[in-house]
Design a protein with these regions (language model features):
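N-terminal amphipathic/basic-hydrophobic helices that include classical n-h-c signal peptides
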Residues: 1-18
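Conserved active-site alpha-helix within GNAT-family acetyltransferase domains
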Residues: 115, 139-161
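Conserved GNAT acetyl-CoA-binding A-motif
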Residues: 125-139
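Acetyl-CoA-dependent GNAT
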Residues: 38, 45-96, 100, 105, ...
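A short, internal acetyl-CoA/4′-phosphopantetheine-binding micro-motif in the GNAT/acyltransferase core
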Residues: 101-109, 137-138
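C-terminal "cap" of GNAT-fold acetyltransferases
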Residues: 155-183
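A short beta-loop-alpha structural element at the N-terminal edge
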Residues: 29-43
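Conserved acetyl-CoA-binding loop-helix of GNAT-fold acetyltransferases
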Residues: 104, 110-124, 146, 150
């Protein structure tokens, strides 16, 4: 791991996520659940359509839905996946969920689904001792920075940032990735 030595910290005491004010009985209600193998194709489509995420193979999304279902979440409207968070627990830090990707269908953006998925995932994992979230974000991805900073603020907890990967760490052209830690 390479580090520029820069560490930025914002402090908020940890608390559970805010309750949703959107009724769950509306026809377009967003429901959250663990992904299933059958969701893998749809997750791949959502990721592909973002035009921003590093697209993994369709196999990777199907496998993720099988092997990391308990640390991931799918948002559905009328039983159709419209968003997802893929994550895993770090073996060397079992109290930490590492969020790999967050994506929401274009027609569902602006409804705070991404933030609500992250809150739902953290709330689901808290009884198992997960009290930290990590993710990597490229320095120019202001939307993701705002998303994760907002989640930390909503949960009244800290968020830190430090360089994790430089462009030289990748075999192809790839931006630097900063590590953000919530909790």
């Amino acid at each position: 791991m390479k580090s520029a030595g820069m560490l930025v910290t914002f402090e908020f005491p940890m608390r559970p996520g805010k309750e949703s004010t959107i009724p769950t009985t509306a026809p377009d209600a967003v429901l959250f659940r663990c992904p299933q193998i059958a969701d893998g194709v749809r997750l791949w489509e959502i990721a592909k359509n973002t035009d921003v995420l590093d697209l993994n193979s369709s196999y990777a999304y199907v496998l993720w839905c099988r092997d990391f279902a308990t640390t991931s979440i799918v948002a559905t409207v009328d039983d159709r996946p419209v968003g997802f968070v893929t994550g895993y627990r770090r073996q060397d830090a079992p109290n930490t969920v590492m969020v790999w990707q967050v994506a929401v269908d274009a027609d569902q953006r602006g409804k705070r689904i991404a933030g609500r998925m992250l809150h739902a995932l953290l709330d689901r994992l808290a009884p198992e001792g997960v009290d930290r979230l990590e993710t990597t974000i490229s320095p120019d991805n202001t939307a993701s920075i705002a998303l994760f900073t907002g989640v930390a603020r909503d949960r009244n907890t800290s968020i830190t940032k430090q360089e994790l990967f430089s462009p030289n760490d990748f075999p192809d052209s790839h931006e630097a990735e900063d590590l953000y830690t919530i909790g």
